[in-house]
């Protein structure tokens, strides 16, 4: 990734505009989970220490454009950052036309960028106004890098200098290492309820990986494609032919999609539903598959332990209910123990990592959802592409 990095620049006395991803959950005016703020502080602290006049903005929620609302205000975020810095970080409400000053080594929070007209549509006029506020634009919001908006793309076109922040650089380096130059064997684990929502990811990965592990509802469609009864389990019958095609395509190049040999079933989706272990060929018409069995989990664990690279996106069972969580737990522990480079991303995956307490034992955890998936699909991320173009133009 040939982009200018913020750490390559002299920021002293410069007006620095950071687009971060501070879209955090808020309840009763307080931030309830500040992982994204923590992840963004590296870039913010760096720019402050370098003597920049630092402005940071983000979206929060989905407000109506052009209308300020308390529920989508960045005030709780500004309070959280002020506490971290031990000094106030001013929240500036109407900032698009300037009308505010920032001192060297000071941080101001620019109110939710989605309150601004033209933000979502990437309006040129809005982007140019943003660009006039700064000498250096720092894109650090990997979570929105797949969207071309005024604060992620437009400003990068017009700012005097456009660069990548520390978090964005780390994300891109980790994804590049895992997907573009992977150590072999390469294993991808893709879970989730539906093949249809991850179809392009599965198709793209099926051409790259040595083993493509499918989990959750997705695995049921592949089980059916392998000729097994899946009972009343979540399964997309219309995509069974595509599952077969992916299995055949991978087999032709000696790669595999491992199919479960045993499963854990119940009769209904309920936290108190008893778990029943069955061989995969013994599922009855009224069963619902909620997890893989211990034999299948051991097989997958062995695959992970022998891997050079593991990409994890999605659990392999209904791990929210402990009786259907053993498969995901086994996989999580193998990912923690393997010598492979491990990359994980997606909300459910991060929830599993937290539940099984392996956060510090995964090589890299991506904070992004949609952008992570689009990178896995092999798509170009617009906000990264524009940084590459600006870097090429500055040589």
Swiss-Prot record:
Domain of life the protein comes from: Bacteria
This protein's UniProt keywords: ATP-binding, Cytoplasm, Glycolysis, Kinase, Nucleotide-binding, Transferase
Gene Ontology biological process terms in this record: gluconeogenesis; glycolytic process
Principal EC category: transferase
Catalytic activity: (2R)-3-phosphoglycerate + ATP = (2R)-3-phospho-glyceroyl phosphate + ADP
Pathway: Carbohydrate degradation; glycolysis; pyruvate from D-glyceraldehyde 3-phosphate: step 2/5
One MF annotation (Gene Ontology) recorded for this entry: phosphoglycerate kinase activity
Binding sites annotated in the UniProt record for ATP: 198, 320, 346-349
Coiled coil regions in record: none
GO cellular component terms attached to this protein's record: cytosol
UniProt binding sites for substrate: 21-23, 36, 59-62, 114, 147
EC number(s) per entry: 2.7.2.3
Subcellular location: Cytoplasm
InterPro entries: Phosphoglycerate_kinase, Phosphoglycerate_kinase_CS, Phosphoglycerate_kinase_N, Phosphoglycerate_kinase_sf
Main localization category: cytoplasm
Similarity-based family: Belongs to the phosphoglycerate kinase family.
Record's subunit section: Monomer.
Listed name of the protein: Phosphoglycerate kinase
Organism: Nitrosospira multiformis (strain ATCC 25196 / NCIMB 11849 / C 71)
Classification of source organism: Bacteria, Pseudomonadati, Pseudomonadota, Betaproteobacteria, Nitrosomonadales
Gene: pgk
